[in-house]
Amino acid sequence: MAFIALGINHKTASVAVRERVAFTPEQMVEALQQLCRLTTSREAAILSTCNRSELYLEIDHPTADDVLAWLADYHRLTLDELRACAYVHQDEDAVRHMMRVASGLDSMVLGEPQILGQMKSAYAVAREAGTVGPLLGRLFQATFSTAKTVRTDTAIGENPVSVAFAAVSLAKQIFSDLHRSQALLIGAGETITLVARHLFEQGVKRIVVANRTLERASLLAEQFGAHAVLLSEIPEELANSDIVISSTASQLPILGKGAVERALKQRKHKPMFMVDIAVPRDIEPEVGELDDVYLYSVDDLHEVVAENLKSRQGAAQAAEELVGSGVTEFMQRLRELAAVDVLRAYRQQAERLRDDELGKAQRQLANGADPAEVLAQLARGLTNKLLHAPSVQMKKMSAEGRIDALALAQELFALDEGAPRH
């Protein structure tokens, strides 16, 4: 049995690679079931965000070569392409990695809170797919507990900083006064919700939310006094938009160079600020070639993010220590679990011996035997039967010269005297 955490993230792979290895929500259940069917993975969960795609596994051997091969094949990459940017963590390192990820310590934005919710969603989907069992389930629960402790006991989450916040901060650098700016937000998920909140708090003049379903767009728009439209209405909204921020789960670009070019002509080449947070990308990279367009991808936000992280660096060490404690506690409990089956079998054996002796004593009492003598025989019989198998095995080990095993038996039975002598 081994735990494995493997994948790619913003530190090891470009956005061009990450979008190729991303899983859509629609793919997730089928992918999980295929992963467990075609590899040695006994339990599995997949976390796929704009910054990382990771697989968390419980497998029956300590290598993940077949899983890497499956991941490359699933996303139509060569194995060499994937190996060039993939990482593999095993057992204690895998546990530590999961806890660091959930705590926001491995994020582009140190301490960002969204990743914990995303990991909880990954766990829920894996449960729906039937690919999470008792071991991986325990690891997820321990991970959530540690991440909660980090969040409540350190300042890692203070001074809100996220990719969404970084995008709005960058917009403020382009348009110093957002009160006169109009924003078009594409998508209606968690990241776009955060963007909308930050823009609303900055007093942006007008927000339009475009989404595949009008119902979802309207639910988000209502929170911030925004206007909701369908994706098909984006071309009409572009000309009025100073700020365009997109984050959907679409597998194909939503905005192309031609549509933006036409909008710029209507705007008389007034600057347009665009941030594509999606992986795969929502906005064709060629849009960035247009004059008067400031197009940023999620990778371009690194510099803005770094500037906003200084206040959280001091809390990072305390958070790492809490993660270390969480890892130690989980690994100890995991080792204790290894004894559960043995203890259960030992107890069942002892209970069978007890029942045999108790039945014999009850029959003797029913036949009129002296109760005191029956009790004495019960005690002697139970003692002899409980000691018989261990006694036979210890004599055998002694005859074989296995002094270390005898010393272990003394520790196991908490004996104070009679230690074997070398």
Swiss-Prot record:
One of its GO terms (molecular function) is NADP binding. NADP(+) binds at G187, A188, G189, E190, T191, I192. Substrate binds at T49, C50, N51, R52, S107, E112, P113, Q114, Q118. Its EC number is 1.2.1.70. The keyword Oxidoreductase applies. Disulfide bonds: none annotated. InterPro entries: 4pyrrol_synth_GluRdtase, 4pyrrol_synth_GluRdtase_dimer, 4pyrrol_synth_GluRdtase_N, GluRdtase_CS, GluRdtase_dimer_dom_sf, GluRdtase_N_sf, NAD(P)-bd_dom_sf, Shikm_DH/Glu-tRNA_Rdtase. Keywords: NADP, Oxidoreductase, Porphyrin biosynthesis. The record marks H97 as: Important for activity. It catalyses: (S)-4-amino-5-oxopentanoate + tRNA(Glu) + NADP(+) = L-glutamyl-tRNA(Glu) + NADPH + H(+). Pathway: Porphyrin-containing compound metabolism; protoporphyrin-IX biosynthesis; 5-aminolevulinate from L-glutamyl-tRNA(Glu): step 1/2. GO terms for biological process: protoporphyrinogen IX biosynthetic process from glutamate. The active site is at C50 (nucleophile). Possesses an unusual extended V-shaped dimeric structure with each monomer consisting of three distinct domains arranged along a curved 'spinal' alpha-helix. The N-terminal catalytic domain specifically recognizes the glutamate moiety of the substrate. The second domain is the NADPH-binding domain, and the third C-terminal domain is responsible for dimerization. Belongs to the glutamyl-tRNA reductase family. Homodimer. Catalyzes the NADPH-dependent reduction of glutamyl-tRNA(Glu) to glutamate 1-semialdehyde (GSA). PANTHER family: GLUTAMYL-TRNA REDUCTASE. During catalysis, the active site Cys acts as a nucleophile attacking the alpha-carbonyl group of tRNA-bound glutamate with the formation of a thioester intermediate between enzyme and glutamate, and the concomitant release of tRNA(Glu). The thioester intermediate is finally reduced by direct hydride transfer from NADPH, to form the product GSA. This is Glutamyl-tRNA reductase.
